[in-house]
Amino acid sequence: MDVTNMPKISVVIVTFNSGNVLEGAIKSFINQDYLNKELVIIDGASKDNTLSIIRKYENNIGYWCSEPDHGIYDAMNKGWARSSGDYILYLGSDDRLLEGGLSALGKNSSGADLVFGDVKCLHENGVVKERITTSNFEVLRIHSIFSHQSLIMKKSLFEKYNGFDCRYKLLADYDLVLRTYLGGAKLQYVHHFISLFNMGGVSAFTYKSDFEKLKIHKSTKSISHPYILFMENLIVKSLLIVKNRWLKI
């Protein structure tokens, strides 16, 4: 692989007291066959063995810090600001890059502003399910079509749009990608499984995320009637909750 012709990808891991899983994420980065890469770790002043693991792999890390932050998206903003890559990918400390993931994104970037692929989801019961991303980008106006573990975005876009809006606690990544899309960013979809996403973290199946999505739709004006979509989502989720309780699922 000719490194000089491949864009540099910075993989940012944001972590806090995740020493029990961080090493696996680091190893999944090291094992990638894509050569023009950089690992950045932003730690929120962990008190467990996180720092000892970071120091163990320090020769494989381009930059790392351990300091207090104001939440996950504040830490993620530090990540892109302190990266040197052409593209940025965010990986959770309990997520894993899959074989050939970075190569699939880097080789198929073709100068696109955002490149994303598919993801495998690890559920709490140990079941792994495949999630195929749609290539119908217009769906972004309504909801997210990607997992940030399978997405690279140009650093220049983070700079142009001032990164993640920390007013959002759950969907700031969706907000940022939506703003770039509405601003004319070029998107590229790659049919390849990029990462294993651990679903044990923040759940998208919450009412809080619906309220955040409503705010995002109103702010970006991505759809004509955001309140109608908001109410439809609430009704569907409420019916599912009633059904699950009735069936004792």
Regions found by a protein language model. Give the residues of each.
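Short aromatic/hydrophobic "clamp" motif used to bind/position activated sugar donors
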Residues: I88
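A conserved acidic beta->alpha catalytic loop
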Residues: S28, L35, D43-S52, G92-D95
